[in-house]
Each structure stands twice: as C-alpha cells, then as structure tokens.
Amino acid sequence: MKKVRFIFLALLFFLASPEGAMASDGTWQGKQYLKEDGSQAANEWVFDTHYQSWFYIKADANYAENEWLKQGDDYFYLKSGGYMAKSEWVEDKGAFYYLDQDGKMKRNAWVGTSYVGATGAKVIEDWVYDSQYDAWFYIKADGQHAEKEWLQIKGKDYYFKSGGYLLTSQWINQAYVNASGAKVQQGWLFDKQYQSWFYIKENGNYADKEWIFENGHYYYLKSGGYMAANEWIWDKESWFYLKFDGKIAEKEWVYDSHSQAWYYFKSGGYMAANEWIWDKESWFYLKFDGKMAEKEWVYDSHSQAWYYFKSGGYMTANEWIWDKESWFYLKSDGKIAEKEWVYDSHSQAWYYFKSGGYMTANEWIWDKESWFYLKSDGKMAEKEWVYDSHSQAWYYFKSGGYMAKNETVDGYQLGSDGKWLGGKATNKNAAYYQVVPVTANVYDSDGEKLSYISQGSVVWLDKDRKSDDKRLAITISGLSGYMKTEDLQALDASKDFIPYYESDGHRFYHYVAQNASIPVASHLSDMEVGKKYYSADGLHFDGFKLENPFLFKDLTEATNYSAEELDKVFSLLNINNSLLENKGATFKEAEEHYHINALYLLAHSALESNWGRSKIAKDKNNFFGITAYDTTPYLSAKTFDDVDKGILGATKWIKENYIDRGRTFLGNKASGMNVEYASDPYWGEKIASVMMKINEKLGGKD
C-alpha cells in the first residue's frame, strides 16, 4: 500500500465535501479531469457517473489516490485509482477504518459488532464503554465484541450477554460477577436481593449442599447456595445447628426458641444426645432428642440409676427434691438415694429412702437386725421417745436409731417388742410437760385446733380444768386449751428446766432455755432483783403486770425512724456481713406500699434470718421464714430473686395472710400473728424484744 498522505486544504471553494459536489460530464486525461466547459478541475470533488464514484482533484490537478483527505472534522479515503471509499473497511498501517456511505470515516461508533475508537481505528482486544448504553463491551482479537460467552482478561473472567453487554453484579448459573464484572473466584458474597450469604469456591461456583471451613469455623451452604443461619441441618447421621452468623455451633449451648429447649453441640458440631456433658462445674444430661433435661428425672441405663436435673439443667447433687408428694435425695454423684440410709449434715439427721427413692416418713424400717423409726419429717428417731399411734405405744430409740427393747430407759421399762410397759407417758401429778413431736396442736374443748407449738416447748398443766387419759388441759403463752397426752412428756420441776423470768435491776428477762434469755421489759419497782418469776402468759406475775411496749403494738402504724436511721442499726449493734445492711430504703418502701411498720419488718427479718446471715437468707433471699416449715425449714422455704424482692415479697405475703385478716400485732399464742405464724410460743415476744433493742439504740422515738 502506498504511504498515506493527509491533505490539509484551505479550501477556497464553496464546495467542501462530496455531498455538495455535482456530477460532471467532463473527461479524464490520465489522472486529470477536464470539466464540461473545458477547464481543468483542481481542489475539488468530481463525481463520475460512469464509474459511479467520487474523486478528489488536488491542487496539482491530479486525483488523490491511496491517501486520506481531511475536510473540516471529517476524513475521507481515496483508494487506488482515486475512487472514494464508502460503506467499507480500509486497512492502513495495520489498522482498520470504516468509511460510511458518504465516505466519511466513522469514529467512536459501532460498525456491526465492531467498534471504532476516537482515531477511527477498529478496536482490537480492548474494553469499550458505551455511554449510550451505559455498558461495557469487550472487542476480541477478531475485532468483534464478545457475546454470550466467558472471556478471561488479564487473569479475570468476565461474562458478556447477548448484544455484548458486560454482566455485572449478577449470577450466571452458579457463578457471580461483581460490580466490575469480574467473576468472584473465592470467598463470601452477600446478595441483597436474596438477603443471604453465599460462598464462592475456588472454581468460581457457589458452594451447594456442602460444608465450608473458613477462618476456623464450619458453615453449611444449602441447596441454591444459601448460607444456613439460625437453623438445624441433618447430616452425617446427626443434627447440627448453624447460628445467626452461620457458624456451626461447637462446644457450646444453644437455646432453640421454637422447641423452647437447650441443646449442646460437641466438638465438630455434633448434637449431644443420650449423653452427659460436664460444664459450669456441673453435669448436664442431653436426652435422646438432644434436649437438655430440666426440672425432670432421667434414668441412665449405664449406671442404672435415676438423676434429677434442676432449673437450668444442673444435675442435683447432695440435695433434696420435692416431687410426687414426697422428698427424694440426690447423693454426691447425683444418683438418687434408694434402699439406703443418707446422713444430712445440714439437719444432722439420718434418713431412709425406699425403693423408688421415696423418703420414708412415719414408718418403721427393719435393717441391721433392728427396727428403726422415721418420723413425720423423715428424720430417724434417735435418743428420743416416739409414740406410734397404730400400736398405741411408746418406743425409745437409742444412739444410732436402734430401737430399745428388754431394757430400762429413764426409769421406764421396755418389753421385748420395744413397747414401753408403763403405758401412757404422763404423770398426773406433774405441773409441767414438754412437747415431744416436731410440732403439736392445741385444741379447744370441742377438738377444734387453736394453734400449734414447737418441740421442746414447756406447757403448764391447768388444774382448774379437767384432764383425762387422752388429753391434758394446758396453758402456754396466754393460750388455754387441750393437748393429746401422746404429744407430751412429764417434767420434774426439781430436775428439769422450766422457763422463767428474772430482773437484773435494769432489764426484765425471759429465760426460755438454759443460758438463753431475751429482754422483754424494763425493770419495775415491784420486781425483786434476782428472783425467778413464772407466768403462763408472760404478762401477769405475782405482784405486778408486765407492759411489753411492742408485743401488742399496732403494726399498721408507721415507724418514726427514717431509712437512714434504720441503716445505722447494723453499726450500732456491731452486725457484720448481713444481706440486710443498707436496706433501710427497701424497708421504708415496704412500709409505705403495704402499710406495715418498717421497724417491725427489720426486727422480724433479724430474728428469722439471724440478721440476714442464715443459710436460707443467703441461698434463697428469704428473711422472714416464709414457708420454712418446722419439719423441712430449708427445703420448703420460698426462694426470692434478690434481697429487695425478699423484703417486699415477704411484706406482701404478711399483709395478705395476717394484717388483712385482723392479726395486726405480734401477740402470743392466744391472739395476734403468733397464733399461726410460728410454732415457737415466744416468737412474738422475741421480735418485740428486738424492736425494743433497736428503739433504744436509735433514741426511743417509737
């Protein structure tokens, strides 16, 4: 090909392009053209009707040939023989150019599936952005745009749709192309349209129905490539759980809100089932369906034993469980106690558990070639008398719980069957009796229950009323009534301790037990210092009547002490490590809300919980002995969530069960709260004593 020459003409003619030229009937003379008027053509276009083509006659009067002509912003190409190129490709210096039907070189335009750039040259192996279509295209080596195919360009794969458009931010089968159009090769991808994560593998396809290990965690990609999250997957003969972030649950607990149960997933993510898990310093059991055992019994076939799992799934050990209307005991290894003896260090007593683990109560047990008796609270009778209503006889159980027989105990003869040969354990000449059972009822003359009193309490024989072999007329803590003879044991006032009162010249004390006394009032002038006084009601004495300032105080009246003053009590009385310390505001809140005296509430809680330091207080936030029954105080005591709820919840309970029912003062066994709240006949007196002590320390405002 001839070297291309660009002709830059400063045209002086009106005619600037072939479109404006006219056909001529002139003649050719070699490379020159004579027009119809005989003049020679120069610097102008000529259209030859014979050749049906345009020619350009240069200034030297020869036609342009194998060269470019620029007119204005347009380029034309004159081929060999001078013919103007049109509607065709022209190759020049290894590049291809396209001349349109008017002979103009096309630029920045599509020619079929090819594209010519700004210079007019056909684009080869390069990207083209078409703003008209707002899309990218790629021109291959053959000059045609890629279409319906993948191309690898500079190490990256791209897909071009029908029409050559570059696919971006879309799926193509199992592959995904990002915003730049490049195929994602490996890694995580979040698709907003599907609101899911996908994982692209090394081959460029998404993971489908398979596990992926990434950054130390396993993930599962479901059918369609969707990442499993907050859901269960059954695989490898086991259940697995994928958490909210898609990670497999492993060596951890998961709560499933649908089944409302906890599950544990072992190493590798396998769901634990029919097996034990040690965690949080406790054993847990995962049942056959994987659910954590909770508030239920589980039989383990391997150890052939029953276990109980508490709230939270913790295995019960060294604890009591109330279930099926019976107490059960779980030993240190969690196994249910069954057909065996158990010593409870807290109650310092032995218990026997029958087949099935049921606690024995009010029953005889034959063991070690001897009879043993389990009382109503399940405790083994030891070093004590027991009345058996079935055989209507008294028995004595020695140290170790062995039933005594063919021997004399405390002067009483026992037969070969263990029965006391002397009949009833009463002495009609005795003035005082002691309560034998854990609790015993006091009845009116018609047999209706009046109150109940605790084991060891001393009652007075009321000689003004008639007693018989079945019941004795008694009086205690202001209450007169009758008690079953089988519940009482005669005392010898010359040898046995009988509760009494005594003044030291400053305080008047009630000695309720050997070396145990409580101040109940200030010294009165009518009192003789050092003299023992006896009273059946704690109010009337020989020569004077006692006025206890708080025993009959109306507890619906507010105290005169503030929360801050109540808080000072602990330092004034040198009381440390108390859960009730700095809870004056809570006691005052209870007073305001439930209209119960805050000083009384503090004193009551102090008595029942040893100033907030008892085991029941620490373990259960129970400071008022709520449902702490005499037979099972710790086990039956109600549990509160925290200290404040323990105070407020108990106050509400006291209001509903006592204050609202007219028992608005502490009282004794004849009237007031003491009638039913506690079996201790001096419970009210003891709380009143604490109130008196606090009142004195705080200045006597009440």
Curated annotation (Swiss-Prot):
It catalyses: an N(4)-(oligosaccharide-(1->3)-[oligosaccharide-(1->6)]-beta-D-Man-(1->4)-beta-D-GlcNAc-(1->4)-alpha-D-GlcNAc)-L-asparaginyl-[protein] + H2O = an oligosaccharide-(1->3)-[oligosaccharide-(1->6)]-beta-D-Man-(1->4)-D-GlcNAc + N(4)-(N-acetyl-beta-D-glucosaminyl)-L-asparaginyl-[protein]. It comes from Streptococcus pneumoniae (strain ATCC BAA-255 / R6). Its EC number is 3.2.1.96. GO terms for cellular component: extracellular region. This is Putative endo-beta-N-acetylglucosaminidase. The lineage of its organism: Bacteria, Bacillati, Bacillota, Bacilli, Lactobacillales. Belongs to the glycosyl hydrolase 73 family. Disulfide bonds: none annotated. Residues 1-23 form the signal peptide. It is found in: Secreted. GO terms for molecular function: amidase activity; mannosyl-glycoprotein endo-beta-N-acetylglucosaminidase activity. InterPro entries: Cell_wall/Cho-bd_repeat (IPR018337), Glycosyl_Hydrolase_73 (IPR051056), LytB_SH3 (IPR041074), LytB_WW-like (IPR040742), MGlyc_endo_b_GlcNAc-like_dom (IPR002901). Keywords: Cell wall biogenesis/degradation, Hydrolase, Repeat, Secreted, Signal. Pfam families: Choline_bind_1 (PF01473), Choline_bind_2 (PF19085), Glucosaminidase (PF01832), LytB_SH3 (PF18342), WW_like (PF17890). It is an enzyme of class 3 (hydrolase). Cell wall-binding repeats lie at residues 42-63, 65-84, 86-105, 124-145, 147-166, 185-206, 208-227, 229-248, 250-271, 273-292, 294-315, 317-336, 338-359, 361-380, 382-403. GO terms for biological process: cell wall organization. Plays an important role in cell wall degradation and cell separation. SUPFAM superfamilies: Cell wall binding repeat.
